[in-house]
């Protein structure tokens, strides 16, 4: 039996997928492979956004996802038809998308690694967009996506062994087996931030560098043309259409969750959960 890093071709059931099930029958209606032959831990952690968007003069019922793979996918949610896929950070596991085959990702064959070959992959094992929620404002017509741009060096152990160590059996279990790349620097792509993307074109409208990555809690947007983002130890507020900075409120506690809004006795509030960096059990709101 082949190990994960020896598989170059496989069917959809073992890949990372977006799929649609008929709720009345439980049967599969359509699926789309976001990362065929995933050997880089680029699973689809991020949630989906459904919207009605005018694309090339047609009103499309779309589903959008920006998972760990670093690619922003837009599909027709009624039938799974591929509309577009654009990297939102530097990526090298994929070289393009086959529009003649419903946008199937074209895997970079040089991205596969083994016992003798280590490969530097963009994005890293933590992903370009993990659990932190993105949001969509239909009035501004933009998606607000917290992202992290980085890399990770993958290699394989000689034999499958849960005690292999040295990063050979998964991210976060011993570090990389080779010297890591520096995260920060003028010649390195290790950056986090917030992007406002236009789903009509799948391109960036505006961006906030340095307000994303692993310390970002996600975004929320309102009908009043505002975007709220928790990142690091700050709550940021922007104009939804232009990205103009309106507020940066420090709260001096790390690990924020995404902001939410609610109303009590006619007054609207913004809330978010945080924690210290030292004891997870010491939660603060």
Go through the PLM ranges and name each one.
Residues 2, 78, 148:
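Anionic group-transfer/hydrolysis microenvironments
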Residues 64-69:
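Acidic/histidine-rich catalytic neighborhood
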Residues 116-120, 126-150:
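Long, low-complexity segments enriched in small/aliphatic residues
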Residues 1, 122-126, 209:
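Short, solvent-exposed secondary-structure boundary motifs
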Residues 1-16, 280-284:
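Single conserved hydrophobic/aromatic residue that forms the stacking wall/gate
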Residues 14-44, 51-59, 71-121, 151-215, ...:
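Extracytoplasmic/lumenal domain signature
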